[in-house]
Curated annotation (Swiss-Prot):
Binds 1 heme b (iron(II)-protoporphyrin IX) group per dimer. The gene is katG1. This is Catalase-peroxidase 1. Homodimer or homotetramer. Keywords: Heme, Hydrogen peroxide, Iron, Metal-binding, Oxidoreductase, Peroxidase. InterPro entries: Catalase_peroxidase, Haem_peroxidase, Haem_peroxidase_sf, Peroxidases_AS, Peroxidases_heam-ligand_BS. Bifunctional enzyme with both catalase and broad-spectrum peroxidase activity. Belongs to the peroxidase family. Peroxidase/catalase subfamily. The lineage of its organism: Bacteria, Pseudomonadati, Pseudomonadota, Betaproteobacteria, Burkholderiales. One of its GO terms (biological process) is hydrogen peroxide catabolic process. PROSITE patterns: PEROXIDASE_1, PEROXIDASE_2, PEROXIDASE_4.
Length: 728
């Protein structure tokens, strides 16, 4: 018998076989319950925006400036200045952002949590965060970690002589890891071609991923799969940076600007490096990568395994990166750790050593640095920047600002005295309110006018949903404000039924014009407001037909953006590949439709109950794309009833697949075999999945219709106002 004591508690956080272990393909709803108030230690009334407004930002910056040259024995500063380390910290925090789903980025301070805190590409950034703790501790709740990371990157640049474009605060911290798909690989830095590879075909990177290997921010600095080919690496760079919304010019500016500072670390073999923070011993207190090579720090530090310093002034802004890139020929070599890198051929030793002032080194570069010279498009931009250093500085300042603010949403969310006055197209600008807004009486009169046009409940509801449901909680883009549903590209998306949409918008524009023309005091209603108001009118009418009197909340204040204020390419990524709320799939996908529904719900910041009640309501209101009848489990469409749930849960119906792909099903009378309904996976999951069925049973009960209506209205109102940051 074993003498090892067994823990008497078998239900602790230490483990046990989970549901996911037993049923790995089971639909995971946990993503809908992340970041709840239960995980937030701040008081319920805490308002981070108000707390930040009380911050003495200048004092924080003074402390950060002092920190830059306050080298600590436990992690000494390269060249006596932490600037390069902090630039990397901010870059890697923001650089996880990807345009496909808006996830990643600097918001929330996710670099504090797994997996990002333990990614190989984030090696030794744990030390950067610990260096910041005294400052975070000093200012407490008035500045979030997320804001502090980016501010520190800015101050690092400024302390090294660079003029930044600006800074906006407002990133509230999160308190647990995001649930983000970073890839299927089971091994850090796994090469392409493996069983879980993110690549297919001719090096086609899986969407929505924006990094070439698991655990990297963008590209492998040694080249694709570690092969030192600068031209091939350029393809990876262009692909990954484009997936983060950066064009070629911004890409060159970011790489060259960032690599003007600091160095990489590869003093010895990686075998000396210990476990990452999440796997390190408890006594290391959240630090990782403890190295046994020499002192394990300073000149003995090992991070990427590369040992490169790009410029002769690594703590000062300069044009040295391009000077060295074009002044030398480069030959392939290896770092002390054995990593592929390049050294200037027949060059003098002009690069200072990070810790020994008596030493000098020849200029060195990464494979991905040389891409800026040997890729024709990058080379043209690089030479222009080399010959026009002021243009380069401006391009880097703007690209850095975009990098570090891309996931913050509209400019109205930026806080602090350093927010730049210039409005930028990538911020999806919307005009400021410049006229008196409609009041409750106006709203009621307008709803009556809308209903009198003859537009159906389905038309009103589907148009409002199409407008508002573009919102992504990940990067705060999209939503009803701006009425971009009437502009390219949204007006032409297949899911929006362009011809039918145009007819609805034309009718609503007529109502808008009649109202605005009748006003004498300058009062106006925007089309953005009117679209949402029309949806409210449709919902109220449908609820009335179900015997429930309800008023959908409405707050005026949206404005209409112009086509000139809309970046068509940047807006195109908001087009849904799937919208289960409208029973829409753009194409056939490997990912099951029900999983895509949950993904959409998470982007809309919905809980599982909110997702459930919205599905049930939108089905009976006839909001399906193209008027499809799948999931319309009612004989009274246009009435806001709980029929979807009642009929889905009816044991008198037997369901069978009606397609080889198991994506459409027929529900027949169990006794007669007569066809009653058709449905998709998105419909049937609410009867199949045990947790969703439990929710469906609440709304399918005999006493549930009024609760169903009121819960639907609450969830509907939430979606309509997701982008109303002015109401928060």
């Amino acid at each position: 018998m074993s003498t090892e004591s067994k823990c008497p508690f078998n239900h602790t956080a230490a483990g046990g076989t989970s549901n996911h272990d037993w049923w790995p393909n089971r639909l995971n709803l946990e993503v809908l319950h992340r970041h709840s108030a239960l995980s937030d230690p701040m008081d319920a009334e805490f308002d981070y925006a108000q707390a930040f407004k009380q911050l003495d930002l200048a004092a924080v910056k003074r402390d950060l400036h002092a920190l830059m040259t306050m080298s600590q024995d436990w992690w000494p500063a390269d060249f006596g200045h932490y600037g390069g380390l902090f630039v990397r910290m901010a870059w890697h925090g923001a650089g996880t952002y990807r345009i496909a789903d808006g996830r990643g980025g600097a918001g929330g301070g996710q670099q504090r949590f797994a997996p990002l805190n333990s990614w190989p590409d984030n090696g030794n950034l744990d030390k950067a965060r610990r260096l910041l703790w005294p400052i975070k501790q000093k200012y407490g709740r008035n500045i979030s970690w997320a804001d502090l990371f980016i501010l520190t990157g800015n101050v690092a640049l400024e302390s090294m002589g660079f003029k930044t474009f600006g800074y906006g605060g407002g990133r509230a911290d999160t308190w647990e890891p995001d649930d983000v798909y970073w890839g299927s690989e089971k091994i850090w830095l796994e090469l392409s071609g493996g069983p879980n590879s993110r690549y297919s075909g001719d090096r086609d990177l899986e969407n929505p991923l924006a990094a070439v290997q698991m655990g990297l921010i963008y590209v492998n600095p040694e080249g694709p799969d570690g092969k030192p080919d600068p031209v091939a690496a350029a393809r990876d760079i262009r692909d990954t940076f484009a997936r983060m919304a950066m064009n070629d010019e911004e890409t060159v500016a970011l790489i060259a600007g960032g690599h003007t500072f600091g160095k990489t670390h590869g003093a010895g073999p990686a075998s000396h490096v210990g476990a990452e923070p999440e796997a390190a011993g408890i006594e290391q207190q959240g630090l990782g990568w403890k190295s046994t090579y020499g002192s394990g720090k300073a000149g003995d530090a090992i991070t990427s395994g590369l040992e490169v310093t790009w410029t002769s002034t690594p703590t000062q802004w300069s044009n040295d990166f391009f000077k060295h890139l074009f002044s030398y020929e480069w030959e392939l070599t290896k770092s002390p750790a054995g990593a592929h890198q390049w050294v200037a051929k027949d060059a003098e030793a002009v690069i200072p050593d990070a810790f020994d002032p008596s030493k000098k080194h020849r200029p060195t570069m990464l494979t991905t640095d040389l891409s800026l010279r040997f890729d024709p498009a990058y080379e043209k931009i690089s030479r222009r920047f080399y010959e026009n250093p002021d243009e380069f500085a401006d391009a880097f300042a703007r690209a850095w600002f975009k990098l570090t603010h891309r996931d913050m949403g509209p400019r109205s969310r930026y806080l602090g005295p350093e927010v730049p006055a210039e409005e930028l197209l990538w911020q999806d600008p919307i005009p400021a309110v410049d006229h008196p807004l409609i009041d409750d009486a106006d709203a009621a009169a307008l709803k009556a006018k809308i209903l009198a046009t003859g537009l159906t409940v389905a038309q009103l509801v589907s148009t409002a949903w199409a407008s508002a449901s573009t919102f992504r909680g990940s990067d705060k883009r999209g939503g009803a404000n701006g009425a971009r549903i009437r502009l390219a590209p949204q007006k032409d998306w297949a899911v929006n039924q362009p011809a039918a949409l145009a007819a609805v918008l034309e009718t609503l524009e007529g109502v808008q014009k009649a109202f605005n023309d009748a006003q004498t005091g300058g009062k106006k209603v925007s089309l953005a407001d009117l679209i949402v108001l029309a949806g409210a009118a449709g919902v109220e009418q449908a609820a009335k037909q179900a015997g429930v009197a309800v008023t959908v909340p409405f707050a005026a204040g949206r404005m209409d953006a112009s086509q000139e204020q809309t970046d068509v390419d940047a807006m195109a990524v908001l087009e849904p590949v799937a919208d289960g709320f409208r029973n829409y799939l753009k194409a056939a996908y490997k990912t099951p439709a029900e999983a895509l529904l949950v993904d959409k719900a998470q982007l809309l910041t919905l809980t599982a109950p909110e997702m459930t009640v919205l599905i049930g309501g939108l089905r009976v209101l006839g909001a399906n794309a193209g008027g499809a009848q799948h999931g319309v489990f009612t004989d009274r469409p246009g009435t806001l009833s709980n029929d979807f749930f009642v009929n889905l849960l009816d044991m008198g119906t037997e369901w069978k697949p009606a397609s080889a792909a198991n994506d459409v099903f027929e529900g027949r009378d169990r006794a007669s075999g007569q066809l009653k309904w058709t449905g998709t996976r998105v419909d049937l999951i609410f009867g199949s999945h045990s947790q969703l069925r439990a929710l469906a049973e609440v709304y399918g009960s005999a006493d549930a219709n009024e609760k169903f209506v009121r819960d639907f209205v609450a969830a509907w109102n939430k979606v309509m106002n997701l982008d109303r940051f002015d109401l928060a």
